[in-house]
C-alpha cells in the first residue's frame, strides 16, 4: 500500500497540461480534490479531481488505486484490483452504444497511469441525496428500468451470437469483480463478519441474524449461483449514490466494478438501498409527509421492477430467438435472486464502515436504532420468503406489514 502513488492537485494540473488533448487551448487550468465532496463510494476508493479552465470548462480526473483510499489514510489496507479501470472504460463504451445518454462521456483513458477522465455532470442530484431530501421524479424509475433491461438483453446470449458473448464475458471475467462482491456482500456481511463495528443497540439482532441457520443456508445458496452463473453484464455497484438524476434524465457512473454475472444483482442492490431509505424515515419524527414519501419509495420500486419486466419482454419478443427462452422461468429465477440480493444488501449497509448516508444522517442513536431494527426485520422476512414471493406487489406488502405490526 503506497500512499505516495496518489497524485496531488498540482500533479493533476501538470498531467492535464502534459496531455494537451483536453483543454488544448486553455491558458489557466486548476484542480480541486473531490475526495471529501462525494456521496458515492467513488470518492472513498479512488483519487478524484475536478479540473477546470478559465472558461469554466470542466472534467473529472479519476486515478484508480489498488486500495481503498479512505481506509488507507486511516492506516487500514483494503486491497482492490487495479484492472478494474478496464472494466470501467469498456463497460462505459458498451453502454454508450446500447444506452446512449445514460452514462458520462470518456475523454481520456490512460491505463499506464490508471487514469480516466470523464464528463463533469452538473445540475443533477445523486439519487440518494434526492431521496434524503424527499424529492420526487416522474420518469426516473422508468429510465432506470430501461438501462437495466437493455443491459440484461444486449449483453446476453438472447441477443449476442455465442462467439460474441464468450468474448465479452471472458473479458469482464478478468476483472475480479465477482470476488470483490463475494467478500463484501456474502463473507463480510454474513458468513465471516470478523471485527465489524456496529451500533451496539442492534448488535444482538445482527448476531442473531448471522447465526440463523436458514439465513446461512440461503446465503450459501445464492452465493453459489452468484459465483458460477454468467448471464449478462452487470454494473456491480448499482445503488442510489451512483446514479445522477433530474426531471428528464439519468446518468449512471462509477462502473469500475462492472462484471459478468447475474443481472438481478443490480436490481437487488438498488432496491435494497431504496428500502434502506424507506427504513431511515422511521428514524424521523412521524408526520404525514414522511408517510407519503414512504409510499412514494414503494411505488418507485414497484414501477421500476414492472417496467423492467415489460421492457425486457419486448426486447425478447422483438429481437431474440424464443426457441430456447422461457420468459416465465427467467422472471421467476430473476425475482428469487433479486429478493436474495435485496436482503444481503440491506445487512451489508448496517455495519458502521458501510453505513449508508440515509441512516448515518440520523444523529440520535436511539432513533437510528429504530430504523436499523426495521431494516433487519424486512431483510430477514424477504430472505425467508425469497422462493415464495411471486411478484413485486407481494414484496411491497411485506415491507408495509412489519411497520403496521
Please provide the spans of the model-predicted regions.
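Active-site acidic catalytic loop and adjacent metal/ATP-binding pocket
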Residues: 38-55, 59-60, 219-265
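ATP/Mg2+ or Mg2+-diphosphate-binding catalytic cores
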Residues: 327-405
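ATP-dependent phospho-/nucleotidyl transfer catalytic cores
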Residues: 128-143, 147, 157-235
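Conserved structural core of kinase catalytic domains
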Residues: 105-143
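A glycine-centered beta->alpha junction motif in the catalytic cores
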Residues: 64-71, 120-134, 153, 276, ...
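Active-site activation/catalytic loop segments of kinase-like enzymes and analogous catalytic loops
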Residues: 264-319, 342-360
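Short, flexible/disordered intra-domain loops and linkers
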Residues: 68-83, 282-296, 360-368
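Conserved NTP-binding catalytic cores of kinases and kinase-like/nucleotidyltransferase enzymes
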Residues: 1-114, 393-405
Amino acid at each position: 500500500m503506497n500512499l505516495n502513488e496518489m497524485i496531488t492537485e498540482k500533479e493533476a494540473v501538470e498531467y492535464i497540461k502534459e496531455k494537451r488533448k483536453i483543454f488544448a487551448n486553455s491558458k489557466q487550468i486548476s484542480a480541486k480534490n473531490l475526495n471529501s465532496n462525494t456521496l458515492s463510494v467513488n470518492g472513498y476508493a479512488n483519487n478524484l479531481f475536478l479540473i477546470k479552465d478559465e472558461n469554466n470548462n470542466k472534467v473529472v480526473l479519476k486515478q484508480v488505486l489498488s486500495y481503498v483510499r479512505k481506509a488507507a489514510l486511516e492506516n487500514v489496507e483494503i486491497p482492490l484490483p487495479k484492472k478494474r479501470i478496464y472494466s470501467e472504460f469498456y463497460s462505459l463504451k458498451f453502454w454508450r452504444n446500447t444506452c446512449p445518454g445514460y452514462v458520462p462521456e470518456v475523454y481520456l483513458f490512460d491505463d499506464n497511469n490508471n487514469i480516466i477522465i470523464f464528463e463533469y455532470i452538473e445540475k443533477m442530484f445523486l439519487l440518494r441525496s434526492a431521496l434524503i431530501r424527499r424529492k420526487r421524479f416522474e420518469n426516473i424509475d422508468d429510465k432506470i428500468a430501461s438501462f437495466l433491461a437493455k443491459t440484461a438483453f444486449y449483453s446476453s446470449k438472447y441477443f449476442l451470437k455465442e462467439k460474441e458473448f464468450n468474448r465479452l464475458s471472458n473479458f469482464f471475467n478478468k476483472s475480479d469483480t465477482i470476488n470483490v462482491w463475494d467478500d463484501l456482500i456474502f463473507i463480510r456481511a454474513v458468513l465471516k463478519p470478523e471485527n465489524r463495528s456496529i451500533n451496539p443497540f442492534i448488535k444482538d439482532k445482527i448476531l442473531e441474524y448471522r447465526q440463523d441457520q436458514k439465513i446461512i443456508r440461503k446465503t450459501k445458496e445464492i452465493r453459489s449461483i452468484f459465483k458460477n452463473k454468467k448471464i449478462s453484464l452487470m454494473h456491480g455497484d448499482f445503488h442510489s449514490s451512483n446514479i445522477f438524476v433530474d426531471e428528464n434524465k439519468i446518468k449512471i457512473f462509477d462502473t469500475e466494478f462492472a462484471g459478468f454475472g447475474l443481472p438481478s444483482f443490480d436490481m437487488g442492490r438498488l432496491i435494497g438501498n431504496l428500502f434502506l431509505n424507506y427504513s431511515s424515515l422511521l428514524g424521523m419524527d412521524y408526520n404525514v409527509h414522511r408517510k407519503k414519501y414512504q409510499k412514494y419509495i414503494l411505488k418507485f420500486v414497484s414501477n421500476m421492477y414492472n417496467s423492467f419486466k415489460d421492457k425486457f419482454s419486448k426486447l425478447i419478443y422483438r429481437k431474440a430467438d424464443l426457441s430456447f427462452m422461457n420468459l416465465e422461468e427467467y422472471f421467476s429465477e430473476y425475482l428469487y435472486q433479486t429478493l436474495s440480493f435485496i436482503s444481503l444488501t440491506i445487512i451489508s449497509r448496517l455495519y458502521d464502515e458501510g453505513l449508508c448516508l440515509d441512516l448515518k444522517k440520523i444523529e440520535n442513536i436511539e432513533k437510528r436504532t429504530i430504523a436499523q431494527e426495521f431494516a433487519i426485520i424486512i431483510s430477514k422476512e424477504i430472505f425467508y420468503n425469497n422462493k415464495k414471493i411471486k411478484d413485486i406487489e407481494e414484496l411491497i406488502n411485506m415491507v408495509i406489514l412489519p411497520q403496521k405490526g
